[in-house]
Amino acid sequence: MDAALLLNVEGVKKTILHGGTGELPNFITGSRVIFHFRTMKCDEERTVIDDSRQVDQPMHIIIGNMFKLEVWEILLTSMRVHEVAEFWCDTIHTGVYPILSRSLRQMAQGKDPTEWHVHTCGLANMFAYHTLGYEDLDELQKEPQPLIFVIELLQVDAPSDYQRETWNLSNHEKMKVVPVLHGEGNRLFKLGRYEEASSKYQEAIICLRNLQTKEKPWEVQWLKLEKMINTLTLNYCQCLLKKEEYYEVLEHTSDILRHHPGIVKAYYVRARAHAEVWNEAEAKADLQKVLELEPSMQKAVRRELRLLENRMAEKQEEERLRCRNMLSQGATQPPTEPPAEPHTAPPAELSTGPPAEPPAELPLSPGHSLQH
């Protein structure tokens, strides 16, 4: 093991455990760096916090892309391919590690770490919710401490050697790709390819959310991005309506209206979702709000009210038939024999049978198009 090497960076010490091959790679902006890592505490047991090899999932970052844990870019750009090195990093570099670790664990579990529908960035969420969902990370968050990173550099790719995902793009590139994704989503929606369309809208939303975290909330540029996000989210919700994912529509539209109570289309889309799950009063209230804010949509609102009335009538008729069938089945069953011996226990409560299942879903109205 080589002696500890200072990287000329305050609060960082490096120890090479296994030498790499070749020259130092050409780390330029946009280079993709792939590596395995293990994170440990500086206690006597060197307690392991995270280990990418345990989930068989190498990590990668893009140079110059403002990675959450900036010190990792410094560490990696000091290494050769196949080198294994241990880095001691002081608290000034490790304060945001719990947030990064949470995202990595979510990815390993197959969850979406971007949480694109959340209005605040990761750092703000940390203070808003007070917990990261993992006891060890909450402890690190509460009491930041130096950490040890053991890193093995596997591969370095030039920007032209790989297909860049949208989240890897620069801010300027993200702004340019959003209208492209938006237009592609609209095209796919018109073709009835709702799953693909929803993916395009979601990808555009992720880009805009990322850009929005760099702006001051409620100022002009932030609000401009927010308006674009809301438009895309409502288009995404229309895909969800077509896929019959009504409760997710209710979640997204309600979130929009909590922050922006004057968006007509959010009320309209939410009304349609309420109607699909037989929330009659809520659907009517939202449609009434649409009329108050946009009287020119009276024709569309009347159509939705007729559909709602038909759906509720069909539901009531099906429930009447179900009850009638249950009563007729009960009347034809032979009486049960009394028990052989009397007992003193109180009689069991009579079961009313399983709750009525909702009727089959009716087809959605082709009605009012809200695509942009």
UniProtKB/Swiss-Prot annotation:
Compositionally biased, Pro residues: which spans?
335-345
- Key word Glycosyltransferase present in the record? no
Q: Which GO terms describe its cellular component?
A: cytoplasm; nucleus
- The residue ranges of the PPIase FKBP-type domain are 53-145
Q: Which UniProt keywords apply?
A: Cytoplasm, Nucleus, Repeat, TPR repeat
Named from the GO MF annotations, one term is: peptidyl-prolyl cis-trans isomerase activity
InterPro entries membership: AIP/AIPL1/TTC9, PPIase_AIP, PPIase_dom_sf, TPR-like_helical_dom_sf, TPR_rpt
The record's listing under SUPFAM superfamilies reads:
FKBP-like, TPR-like
Disordered, as annotated region: 315-372
Instruction: Report any Pfam family annotated for this entry.
Output: PPIase_AIP
Q: What does this protein do?
A: May be important in protein trafficking and/or protein folding and stabilization.
This chain belongs to which protein, by name? Aryl-hydrocarbon-interacting protein-like 1
What is the source species? Answer: Papio cynocephalus (Yellow baboon)
Gene name for this UniProt entry:
AIPL1
